[in-house]
Swiss-Prot record:
MF-aspect GO terms: ATP binding; ATP hydrolysis activity; ATP-dependent protein folding chaperone; heat shock protein binding; protein folding chaperone; unfolded protein binding
Name of the featured protein: Chaperone protein DnaK
Annotated region described as Disordered, given as residue ranges: 525-544, 576-610
Species this protein is from: Staphylococcus aureus (strain NCTC 8325 / PS 47)
Biased amino acid composition, Basic and acidic residues: 529-542, 599-610
């Protein structure tokens, strides 16, 4: 079976891994980094992903960041006259990671396990799966990030029985999961979280503070300046990271704006205590889901054996301190918070291929599932934290006499009223025979698969007529849309390849022109006038071709110049060889000269010197 790669598709950074033997290995990207920024930029028809896209975000408005926050919604990004869905942008990041894995493995990769926040709903999970498909990946499994982290942490501890709390604060999402580990079984007991809380929010409180300070000092509102905001975002992210290691940091942004008297500069000294004050409400927001997960698992602090911190934002000292205070236990710092999730995904890939044995993963659904009933209430069929895959059925009936059809409104959430929960989908069961209300027997069945994706069936037990749907939210893509996006991705990949080849060809041709000019100068009088003229003509022809857009013309002119320079080099080499032979002949003649005399010498002993 071909390799299944593990991918942590993050809000801020992404990571790709593969199982080598029985150990997960993080694959470095072409820049040598173990994580890749989840950033996509568009410039002159070219798509850039990762570090190169992030570097030019300040000057390029067509740069997309933190797209994960929009997964499962109908959000669109309009760039250069074209609209992109979050699935398409995510697919570009996945395609980049896929290429990195293929370069490392030296073989085609078409299967992956992709991680998602535990608190992702059905629409967000389906969108992630669609993104994988667009990128040319068969998504073998969608796995929850805290579960993946526990898998990586506990793989070599299968002989222990432990209850582990995974606190996962990433770039844009927050999850907390509690798992029980023992005898190779990884069972999720509960999960809770907030999909709108992460490192981006910690950056934002610093940005807001800098904007307020600058406005107070200079009367200029930087929040209205896009380029200034991007510079502030980069500076805030750097300051946040700095304050994990030092107690204060200097934020210096020269020429950030201009006033009546000339350029304005931003200079702010930010202390760790000030940052903690600014971000206090965010840290407090992480505590409620933590308490909820503990309550749902039926555990007390003394039951928790280990606390694992996952996600780059858990490096913030105030976050670590808050977790320690809440659980009463020092967090385990033996795992890399940026890589552990992707490593767990690779292990899950190994479980699927059979390379990892005696490991069983029992995950849960993060939110309750049900349907709307009379009075606009939600009737729950599957409670949150139910182990998946699972199936649950319930009998319903009609609300009025002779009702010919029933509308099934599928919901996900914890609120009692249907309107307060998320609509996953709607469908209709028709042709119900006329009967008094309450008589027809309508069986509604919910199925949740191993990826946490929902299927719903409604069946009239009187006629055995059945209606079944896989939940499609308003943001879900049809098969036709996915196929079109797959083709677009393939075409773009081919176009990007051609563009790279064109750039390489132009660079090689440019280098050849420089090399020929240098060679002609170095040879000077040692080259015939005719040969020199031929080389000059071919060189000028290539320079002219480089000014145009005809790639084939550049290629042929380059080949012609290469041929001339090879012939020229051969002639110069022959001349040099002849000159060397003549020089050796002259030296040999000098060695046979009759004027050479033998010298006599007399040995002088030490005694003779006295």
């Amino acid at each position: 079976m071909s390799k299944i790669i593990g991918i942590d598709l993050g809000t801020t950074n992404s990571c790709v891994t593969v199982l080598e033997g029985d150990e997960p290995k993080v694959i470095q990207n072409p820049e040598g980094s173990r994580t890749t920024p989840s950033v996509v930029a568009f410039k002159n028809g070219e798509t850039q992903v990762g570090e190169v896209a992030k570097r030019q975000a300040i000057t390029n408005p067509n740069t997309v960041q933190s797209i994960k926050r929009h997964m499962g919604t109908d959000y669109k990004v309009d760039i250069e006259g074209k609209s992109y869905t979050p699935q398409e942008i995510s697919a570009m990041i996945l395609q980049n990671l896929k290429n990195t894995a293929e370069s490392y493995l030296g073989e085609k990769v078409d299967k992956a396990v992709i991680t998602v926040p535990a608190y992702f709903n059905d629409a967000e999970r389906q969108a992630t799966k669609d993104a994988g498909k667009i990128a040319g990946l068969e998504v073998e499994r969608i796995i929850n990030e805290p579960t993946a982290a526990a898998l990586a942490y506990g793989l070599d501890k299968t002989d222990k029985d432990e209850k582990v709390l995974v606190f996962d604060l990433g770039g844009g999402t927050f999850d907390v999961s509690i798992l029980e580990l023992g005898d190779g079984v990884f069972e999720v007991l509960s999960t809770a979280g907030d999909n709108k809380l992460g490192g981006d929010d910690f950056d934002q409180v610093i940005i807001d503070y800098l904007v307020a300070e600058f406005k107070k000092e200079n009367g200029v509102d930087l929040s209205q300046d896009k380029m200034a905001l991007q510079r502030l975002k980069d500076a805030a992210e750097k300051a946040k990271k700095d304050l994990s290691g030092v107690s204060q940091t200097q934020i210096s942004l020269p020429f950030i704006s201009a006033g009546e008297n000339g350029p304005l500069h931003l200079e702010v000294n930010l202390t760790r205590s000030k940052f903690e004050e600014l971000s206090d409400s965010l840290i407090r927001r992480t505590m409620e889901p933590t308490r909820q997960a503990m309550k749902d698992a039926g555990l007390t602090n003394s039951d928790i054996d280990e606390v694992i911190l996952v996600g780059g934002s858990t490096r913030i000292p105030a976050v670590q301190e808050a977790v320690k205070k809440e659980i009463g236990k020092e967090p385990n710092k033996g795992v890399n918070p940026d890589e552990v999730v992707a490593m767990g995904a690779a292990i899950q890939g190994g479980v699927i291929t059979g390379d990892v044995k005696d490991v069983v993963l029992l995950d849960v659904t993060p939110l309750s599932l049900g349907i709307e009933i009379l009075g606009g209430r939600m009737n729950t069929l599957i409670e949150r934290n139910t182990t998946i895959p699972t199936s649950k059925s319930q009998i319903y009936s009609t609300a009025v006499d002779n009702q010919p059809s029933v509308d099934v409104h599928v919901l996900q959430g914890e609120r009692p009223m249907a309107a307060d929960n998320k609509t996953l989908g709607r469908f209709q069961l028709t042709d119900i025979p006329p009967a008094e209300r309450g008589k027809p027997q309508i069986e509604v069945t919910f199925d949740i698969d191993k990826n946490g994706i929902v299927n719903v069936t409604a069946k009239d037990l009187g006629t055995n007529k059945e209606q079944r749907i896989t939940i499609q939210s308003s943001s879900s893509l049809s098969d036709e849309e996915i196929d079109r996006m797959v083709k677009d991705a393939e075409v773009n990949a081919e176009a990007d390849k051609k563009r790279r080849e064109e750039v390489d060809l132009r660079n090689e041709a440019d280098s050849l022109v420089f090399q020929v000019e240098k060679t002609l100068t170095d040879l000077g009088e040692n080259i015939g006038e005719e040969d020199k003229k031929s080389a000059e003509e071919k060189k000028d022809a290539l320079k002219t071709a480089l000014e145009g857009q005809d790639i084939e013309d550049i290629k042929s002119k380059k080949e012609e110049l290469e041929k001339v320079i090879q012939e020229l080099s051969a002639k110069v080499y022959e001349q040099a060889a002849q000159q060397q032979q003549q020089a050796q002949g002259a030296n040999a003649g000098q060695n046979n000269d009759s004027t050479v005399e033998d010298a006599e010498f007399k040995e002088v002993k030490d005694d003779d010197k006295k």
